[in-house]
Amino acid sequence: MTAPNQDDFLLVGRISAAFGVRGELKISMISSHPEHIQKLKQLFVGDLSKPYTIGRLHQHKGSLYLLRLNEVDTRDAAEAMQGLEAYIHRSDAAPLANDEYFLHDLVGLQVQTEAGEDIGRAVEIIETGANDVLVVRKLGQADILVPMVRTVVRSIDIAGGTITVTSLADIVPE
């Protein structure tokens, strides 16, 4: 059996703890469309090899949700899942608006300034809470951290493979 292709899946949350004695899980949702995930029938946890059937998913507090997976019915089984990441198949994702994108799709894009200066390639997204930060790497140079805010990131062209940002002077302190 072939291992699942990571690119076919989207990270939607992280299991933070067991809840109760019947196998419910606390999950920190990182999806901007948790209401869409509530309508889905399956979720992949951990190594992506096995789908779990969603019995119930509802908001608990803020971005914390309670998740019931039909295959997880004891506290011990739920505790064994603590710290694992939860994914949905890309084909199950909510449709994106024109100005929306999956963070995962930014990794690998070329980053340039509005003047056309090559800054490097996006290698990682750091989720900070206030705003995401794009890590840009160019061979032989220190990584550049680019805040993912409209005043800095001018455009994202997934199809064209580029992210355009303001000038380097606006991003990198001297």
From Swiss-Prot:
Residues 98-171 form the PRC barrel domain. InterPro entries: PRC_barrel-like_sf (IPR011033), PRC_RimM (IPR056792), RimM (IPR011961), RimM_N (IPR002676), RimM_N_sf (IPR036976), Transl_B-barrel_sf (IPR009000). Keywords: Chaperone, Cytoplasm, Ribosome biogenesis, rRNA processing. It comes from the Bacteria. The keyword Nucleus does not apply. It is found in: Cytoplasm. SUPFAM superfamilies: PRC-barrel domain, Translation proteins. One of its GO terms (cellular component) is cytoplasm. The keyword rRNA processing applies. GO terms for molecular function: ribosome binding. GO terms for biological process: ribosomal small subunit biogenesis; rRNA processing. The PRC barrel domain binds ribosomal protein uS19. Belongs to the RimM family. An accessory protein needed during the final step in the assembly of 30S ribosomal subunit, possibly for assembly of the head region. Essential for efficient processing of 16S rRNA. May be needed both before and after RbfA during the maturation of 16S rRNA. It has affinity for free ribosomal 30S subunits but not for 70S ribosomes. Binds ribosomal protein uS19. NCBIfam families: 16S_RimM (TIGR02273). This is Ribosome maturation factor RimM. It comes from Herpetosiphon aurantiacus (strain ATCC 23779 / DSM 785 / 114-95). The lineage of its organism: Bacteria, Bacillati, Chloroflexota, Chloroflexia, Herpetosiphonales. The gene is rimM.
